[in-house]
């Protein structure tokens, strides 16, 4: 249990790029948070009232699927605290996964651009704007110890690993969620239970 799939499709209006998918093992804290919120939202059964029914904010979808049960809600924005918390968590996971894909590409094609990307990631980690960093830790670790990568990039990667390890230890000793709700960005996310 704990296998999670992150799937991203290109911008629906421009249809640029290819769909991407990655599987990773979500932390127990994240799994628990997602399923507690999903349960509070009745496993996404029924209709959800949104603050912006004309779609100016960008549509979001949440899906719960287990066996023959498949529930989905679509919304633009919501004042519901559980929806906000779940949206924020999925946004942070999405940002983390996108960084992983970008770092992999830069490592292969443009190692000199890694330093700027890693520095930006460091700022987001410090502000706790990423979630499930463990999913992309292997690529960051590979950068940190790859002698073909410029030293500045390797140093940023090592610092990033150290900071995320510190935050992981801090979260492990706390039962509180590691994020707080604030302004949300458009996204698409799927919550799916895996056995």
Give a label for each model feature.
Residues 1-4, 67-69:
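Short, solvent-exposed coil/turn segments at beta-strand boundaries
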Residues 20-25, 74:
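A short, exposed loop/beta-hairpin motif centered on an aromatic-Gly-Thr core
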Residues 27-51:
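Charged, amphipathic alpha-helical segments
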Residues 1, 29, 57-59:
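Extracytoplasmic
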Residues 25-33, 64-70:
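A short, structured loop/turn motif at beta-sheet edges
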Residues 24, 28, 80-83:
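Generic detection of long, well-ordered alpha-helical segments
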Residues 47-195:
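Short, well-ordered, aromatic-rich surface patches in folded extracellular/luminal domains
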Residues 2-22, 119-123, 137-141:
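Acidic/histidine-rich, surface-exposed loop or edge segments in extracytoplasmic proteins
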């Amino acid at each position: 249990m704990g296998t999670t799939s992150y799937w991203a499709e290109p911008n629906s209006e421009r249809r640029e790029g290819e769909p991407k998918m990655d599987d990773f093992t979500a932390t127990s804290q994240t799994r628990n948070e997602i399923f507690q919120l999903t349960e509070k939202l009745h496993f996404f059964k029924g209709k959800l009232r949104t603050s912006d029914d004309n779609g100016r904010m960008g549509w979001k979808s949440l899906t719960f699927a287990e066996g023959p049960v498949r529930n989905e809600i679509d919304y633009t924005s919501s004042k519901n605290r559980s929806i906000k918390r779940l949206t924020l968590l999925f946004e942070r996971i999405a940002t983390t996964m996108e960084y992983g894909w970008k770092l992999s590409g830069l490592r292969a094609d443009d190692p000199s651009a890694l330093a700027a990307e890693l520095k930006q990631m460091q700022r987001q980690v410090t502000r706790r704007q990423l979630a499930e960093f463990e999913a992309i830790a292997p690529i960051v670790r590979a950068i940190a110890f790859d002698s073909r990568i410029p030293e500045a990039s390797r140093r940023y990667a090592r610092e990033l690993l150290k900071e995320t390890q510190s935050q992981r230890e801090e979260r492990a000793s706390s039962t509180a969620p590691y994020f707080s709700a604030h302004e949300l960005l458009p996204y698409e996310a799927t919550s799916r239970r895996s056995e």
